[in-house]
């Protein structure tokens, strides 16, 4: 099976970017609540 590096990077970014965005929002909300 051939590994497509661009597809792997695109998938990683597609998963990591929303996760990081939600994580930042969660941290900001938690900081404001405290």
Swiss-Prot record:
Keyword Membrane carried by entry: yes
A Pfam family recorded for this sequence: PsbM
Transmembrane domains' residue ranges: 5-25
Subcellular location as annotated: Plastid, Chloroplast thylakoid membrane
Membrane topology: Single-pass membrane protein
Annotated PANTHER family: PHOTOSYSTEM II REACTION CENTER PROTEIN M
Oligomeric and partner information: PSII is composed of 1 copy each of membrane proteins PsbA, PsbB, PsbC, PsbD, PsbE, PsbF, PsbH, PsbI, PsbJ, PsbK, PsbL, PsbM, PsbT, PsbX, PsbY, PsbZ, Psb30/Ycf12, at least 3 peripheral proteins of the oxygen-evolving complex and a large number of cofactors. It forms dimeric complexes.
Family per similarity comment: Belongs to the PsbM family.
Protein role: One of the components of the core complex of photosystem II (PSII). PSII is a light-driven water:plastoquinone oxidoreductase that uses light energy to abstract electrons from H(2)O, generating O(2) and a proton gradient subsequently used for ATP formation. It consists of a core antenna complex that captures photons, and an electron transfer chain that converts photonic excitation into a charge separation. This subunit is found at the monomer-monomer interface.
Protein name, per record: Photosystem II reaction center protein M
Source taxonomy: Eukaryota, Viridiplantae, Streptophyta, Embryophyta, Tracheophyta
Gene from which the chain derives: psbM
